[in-house]
């Protein structure tokens, strides 16, 4: 029995991650893979009390849904699962990619500094990933 290949893609709402989702969905179409879209969230270190009405998990889920809706237009035949995880993005992606055939990330996320060739999450995944990692450039 052969299992369906899995492509994990990191989603943070940045233009780079939108391009990564498009690239990953095309690859999923070509290979018959399931697309596993992963977003993560965590409280900034400087926040000690959660402000009323703030729900980072729900905000992250909303961003994930919006990016997928826009980026997957025309890819309705691709099977997609969505995962919102509490924690730093690099380790969250690698945990979700343990059984994956491919991990796809954008070259730069929301926190990238102008002129950087590779963002910290992309670099983390390339250095520590256990499966092939594709970095989609802007």
Q: Which functions belong to the PLM regions below?
A:
Residues 128-137:
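Short, acidic/small-residue loops that bind anionic groups at enzyme active sites
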Residues 64-72:
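A conserved short alpha-helical segment within the catalytic HATPase_c
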Residues 39, 106-108, 137-138:
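Short secondary-structure boundary segments
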Residues 52-63:
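A short acidic, glycine-rich active-site loop
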Residues 36-38, 81-85, 134:
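General small-molecule cofactor/ligand-binding pocket signal
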Residues 1-3, 16, 30, 72-105:
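Structural beta-alpha unit
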Residues 2-54:
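Small/aliphatic-rich secondary-structure junction motif
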Residues 102-127:
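Glycine-rich, Arg-bearing micro-motifs that act as flexible, cationic patches
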């Amino acid at each position: 029995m052969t299992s369906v290949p899995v492509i994990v893609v990191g989603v943070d709402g940045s233009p780079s991650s939108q391009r990564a989702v498009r690239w990953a969905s095309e690859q999923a179409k070509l290979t018959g893979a399931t697309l596993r879209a992963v977003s993560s969230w965590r409280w900034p270190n400087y926040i000690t009390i959660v402000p009323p009405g703030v729900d980072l998990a729900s905000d992250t889920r909303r961003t994930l849904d919006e990016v997928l809706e826009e980026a997957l237009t025309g890819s309705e035949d691709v099977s997609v699962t969505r995962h919102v995880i509490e924690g730093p993005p690099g380790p969250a992606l690698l945990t979700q990619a343990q059984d994956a055939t491919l991990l796809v990330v954008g070259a730069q996320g929301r926190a990238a500094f102008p002129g950087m060739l590779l963002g910290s999450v992309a670099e983390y995944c390339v250095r520590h990933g256990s499966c092939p990692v594709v970095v989609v450039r802007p």
